[in-house]
């Protein structure tokens, strides 16, 4: 009571405008049904009940979605870059399969500087995030952009997300304090990392 919730419905793994438009239509049908019902009356002394505005967006978690972000933005209120899946699909390997054996060998041999599942690969996955942000905002200037996944709690990755123009990061609860600090440092310091 008394709160104004931010309601966002995120449609995962979309790869075409048509697919997202279809799924958005299903969500809008349900919302129209809900909105056609009477709003319960507020009790005496309480604020009147208002229906929250509902935003409908999609996850950018495949390379194709990043490449076609301009088309997806036409039918989306926001994007959330799902960097765990985007990293897997960009590198072509499963996080579960590589972290125990292959990744330590890659790091030891110097093939990668760090695991791309902890700190975003700025030259590959990061480029896709920049591309999605740029292409999406070219179509819809006010498009809300964010990231979800473990990268949302990594200081170096947060700096890159700030430079890409993302509005928010989300991460595991235990990473929230460092994410907040890193986001503030990115804003104050201009995100040079």
Regions found by a protein language model. Give the residues of each.
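Conserved alpha/beta-domain cores
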Residues: 1-193
């Amino acid at each position: 009571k008394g709160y104004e919730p931010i309601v966002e419905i995120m449609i995962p793994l979309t790869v075409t405008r048509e697919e997202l438009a279809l799924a958005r239509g299903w969500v809008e049908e349900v919302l129209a049904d809900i909105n056609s019902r009477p709003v319960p009356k507020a009790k005496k002394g309480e604020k009147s009940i208002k229906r929250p505005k509902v935003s409908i967006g999609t996850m950018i978690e495949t390379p194709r979605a990043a490449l076609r972000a301009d088309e997806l933005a036409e039918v989306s209120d926001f994007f959330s870059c799902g960097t765990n899946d985007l990293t897997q699909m960009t590198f072509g390997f499963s996080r579960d399969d590589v972290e125990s054996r292959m990744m330590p060998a890659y790091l030891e041999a110097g093939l990668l500087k760090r695991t791309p599942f902890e700190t975003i690969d700025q030259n590959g996955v990061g480029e896709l995030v920049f591309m999605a942000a740029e292409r999406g905002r070219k179509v819809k200037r006010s498009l809300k952009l964010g990231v979800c996944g473990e990268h949302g709690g990594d200081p170096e990755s947060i700096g890159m997300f700030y430079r890409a123009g993302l509005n928010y990061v989300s991460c595991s609860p235990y990473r929230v304090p460092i994410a907040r600090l890193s986001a503030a440092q990115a804003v104050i310091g201009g995100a040079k990392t």
